[in-house]
Amino acid sequence: MTNAAFLLLLTLTACVAPCPADAVGFEHLTPAKAAAEALRHRNKSKSKAFEDRFHPTYPSVCNVKKCAAREASACLRGAVMYQIFTRMFTPEGTFKAAERKLPELKELGVDIIYLTPHQLADDDQDPRFWSARQRKCGFGNPKNPYRQKDFYAVDPEYGSAQDLKDFVIAAHRLGMKVMFDLVYFHCGPKASFLTEHPDFIVRNPDGSPLLGEWAFPEMDISRREVRDYLYANMEGFVRDYDADGFRCDVADMLPVDFWEEGYLRCKALKPDFFMMCEGLKGDDQRLAFDLSYGFYTQWTMVELLKGAQPASVLRTAWEAQQRDYPKGFHWMRCFENHDFANVNPGEKRKEELYGHDLNAAMIATIFLLDGVPMLYNGQEIADASPQSIFSNRDHGGWHVDWTKADEPYALERRNLVKRLASIRHGNPDLFDAPVIWLETGAADRVYAFRRDLPGQPLTLAVNISAEPAAIRLEGTDVTVPPKSFVIRRGPNLQIDRKERKQ
């Protein structure tokens, strides 16, 4: 794209979701100072009450009460997302092995593959540059996919650059989109560009790298040369690999205008391009992002699985998101991903700790809430095998246990996901139709909401307790099984997790 074309595109889109500036904003600070200010803002109001966790992690430049999010990419309406953590998705941990499972994901109802980082990870052995959980896990694997040595190179652990291209081609042939993972806040201590460009990272007065929150050197995004280097990387993924979108790691630790320019550059190459933000900042969807992580509901569903909070807190979390973010904000809904599934040796996953039934109820919840639902590595077979960011075929050998995919509980889960995906595909307005929370008369045990859609409304009731819950739902007596759910279509048809109809 020429500079003139880019400037024209920037001018045409600059007025999307106008936001009057507030006094609060850190865009003018260096990345290091901005991160420090954001951390102080994030921790400024700590309390023992779980609900006090519901607030933006980072301050906004704009007044969220007067802002509006831009329109999201049309491909997200009715879509189902699936995260593949490549090194543990299959025993081989390669793109080729993952490619062979793409037809299964298509049959499941998946529309978008979110592929975790494929870039060359740094193999530096110095534990000073390892994150706390990297040291704690005990695998001794220096290669953290989120600590990268070369943003442009494909890590041979997963295969070749052509293998990655073939994966994308295969997904596209099946009608699925592929989203790559970008990690630009930091890099590895042996990053390939540091020899020629030592000024690409933030440095202390003595010249040593400034280490960020995860003990990795921080990229100096304040430098135009760094931005251009990363923009070329983004454009290359779209142009050379045909990536459809990006998930942006800890995106709010970088200035939002960095992401906005990157989005515009990529959208000029692919009109239906989209981006997802791992962050909680009101400015994020002004222009840069189509989706943000629904952390409020994500945290809450984990607490509900544990039995640590009453059912009513999910409504509190959802309403807090409506309060804290601009009109039209869109969320990715999940309760399991590579971070939340990460365990150390000897620890158990949610499926084993809290049971398949309640996990299924949470899956039904993310599919029927607004936004886009996302499944993670093997959730569709209720996989309980341990997962770690730092395990691969050479370190621990952990991976999804596909040998159990034909167990009765796995088949039941797969059938449930297929039915939920079918509901999602048949009702694209689930993306942004109003969520109407309902009184159940048992707020500590049961939450329920209705989605008013063209035709018949959809209602979900979830019982997080260990006993059946007899409730009155919009004038009808309904019994919700223990640690399970009921979906109602219209006034009469009722479906539970095994598709029994009443």
Please place each PLM-identified region on the residue numbering:
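Short, solvent-exposed turn/loop segments enriched in Gly/Ser/Thr/Pro and often Arg
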Residues: 114-123, 181-190, 249-255, 278-282, ...
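Substrate-binding/active-site clefts of carbohydrate-active enzymes
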Residues: 66-96, 102-111, 117-241, 261-269, ...
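Structural preference for beta-strand elements that scaffold enzyme active sites
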Residues: 79-83, 112, 175-179, 243-247, ...
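Loop/helix patches that line or flank the sugar-binding groove of alpha-linked glycan CAZymes
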Residues: 72, 76, 123, 325-470, ...
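Active-site-proximal helices and loops of the catalytic beta/alpha 8
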Residues: 26-32, 36-65, 239, 249-331, ...
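C-terminal beta-sandwich/jelly-roll accessory domains of carbohydrate-active enzymes
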Residues: 464-502
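Bacterial N-terminal signal peptides
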Residues: 5-14
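Conserved, mostly hydrophobic/aromatic
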Residues: 84, 105, 115, 151, ...
